[in-house]
């Protein structure tokens, strides 16, 4: 595939959506064909599954069904959106991907790592991010940001309700993934100003990909 696949990961309130928007605008100004998308979601079917997951409805059926729903959404997303876009040479920016599943569902040992690995293999079909930005902030800071966003939107999703201890465990799990795959991950301190973070991401893109993508 001639395109380039970039994912953004991190806990709640780290600013992924904002940074994706800023990077997409910058890359388009540089003349690149850019697609922004998200998980779960990205297609009509996957967005319907997203609603089920984030509303907490899937919790009624247990963690295995939750993971199966995520896998179904990812298969549809990759097949209908990500793979075709990469084949067309686009830069794909995705808000969450496989690493979020590894962290959010992986910390729930009731499913089992072997089941997660099999479902991951089936869903990905050989497609993995070329570059992953991990936006990292202390869990307490992330929750404070998420609370502010929630007040503005007057909504709260299932995963944002988790307590501070769990959020910090997820943060550490993301950092561990970054240590295991240093060639793919770039950890960004997301406690600073939005513009400073955006510039760091732009600099990394120049170093890593912009000379490679036609």
Swiss-Prot record:
<dbReference type="GO" id="GO:0004798">
    <property type="term" value="F:dTMP kinase activity"/>
</dbReference>
<keyword id="KW-0545">Nucleotide biosynthesis</keyword>
<dbReference type="GO" id="GO:0006227">
    <property type="term" value="P:dUDP biosynthetic process"/>
</dbReference>
<feature type="binding site">
    <location>
        <begin position="10"/>
        <end position="17"/>
    </location>
    <ligand>
        <name>ATP</name>
    </ligand>
</feature>
<comment type="similarity">
    <text>Belongs to the thymidylate kinase family.</text>
</comment>
<keyword id="KW-0418">Kinase</keyword>
<dbReference type="InterPro" id="IPR018094">
    <property type="entry name" value="Thymidylate_kinase"/>
</dbReference>
<dbReference type="GO" id="GO:0006235">
    <property type="term" value="P:dTTP biosynthetic process"/>
</dbReference>
<protein>
    <recommendedName>
        <fullName>Thymidylate kinase</fullName>
        <ecNumber>2.7.4.9</ecNumber>
    </recommendedName>
</protein>
<dbReference type="GO" id="GO:0005524">
    <property type="term" value="F:ATP binding"/>
</dbReference>
<keyword id="KW-0808">Transferase</keyword>
<keyword id="KW-0067">ATP-binding</keyword>
<dbReference type="InterPro" id="IPR018095">
    <property type="entry name" value="Thymidylate_kin_CS"/>
</dbReference>
<dbReference type="GO" id="GO:0005829">
    <property type="term" value="C:cytosol"/>
</dbReference>
<dbReference type="GO" id="GO:0006233">
    <property type="term" value="P:dTDP biosynthetic process"/>
</dbReference>
<keyword id="KW-0547">Nucleotide-binding</keyword>
<comment type="function">
    <text>Phosphorylation of dTMP to form dTDP in both de novo and salvage pathways of dTTP synthesis.</text>
</comment>
<dbReference type="InterPro" id="IPR039430">
    <property type="entry name" value="Thymidylate_kin-like_dom"/>
</dbReference>
<dbReference type="InterPro" id="IPR027417">
    <property type="entry name" value="P-loop_NTPase"/>
</dbReference>
<dbReference type="Pfam" id="PF02223">
    <property type="entry name" value="Thymidylate_kin"/>
</dbReference>
């Amino acid at each position: 595939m001639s395109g380039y696949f970039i994912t953004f990961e991190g806990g709640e309130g780290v600013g992924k959506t904002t940074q994706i928007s800023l990077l997409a605008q910058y890359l388009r100004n540089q003349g690149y064909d850019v697609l922004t998308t998200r998980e779960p979601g990205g297609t009509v079917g996957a967005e319907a599954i997203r609603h089920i997951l984030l509303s907490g409805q899937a919790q009624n059926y247990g963690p295995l069904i939750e993971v199966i729903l995520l896998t179904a959404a990812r298969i549809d997303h990759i097949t209908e959106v990500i793979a075709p876009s990469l084949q067309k040479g686009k830069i794909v920016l995705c808000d969450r991907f496989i690493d979020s599943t590894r962290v959010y569902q992986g910390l729930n040992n009731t499913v089992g790592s072997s089941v997660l690995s099999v479902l991951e293999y089936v869903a990905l079909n050989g497609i993995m991010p070329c570059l992953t930005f991990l936006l990292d902030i202390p869990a307490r800071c992330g929750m404070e940001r998420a609370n502010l966003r929630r007040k503005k939107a007057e909504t709260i999703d299932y995963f944002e309700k988790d307590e501070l201890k769990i959020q910090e465990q997820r943060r550490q799990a993301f950092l561990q993934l970054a240590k295991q795959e240093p060639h793919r991950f770039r950890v960004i301190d997301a406690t600073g100003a939005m513009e400073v973070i955006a510039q760091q991401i732009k600099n990394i893109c120049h170093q890593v990909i912009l000379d490679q993508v036609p």
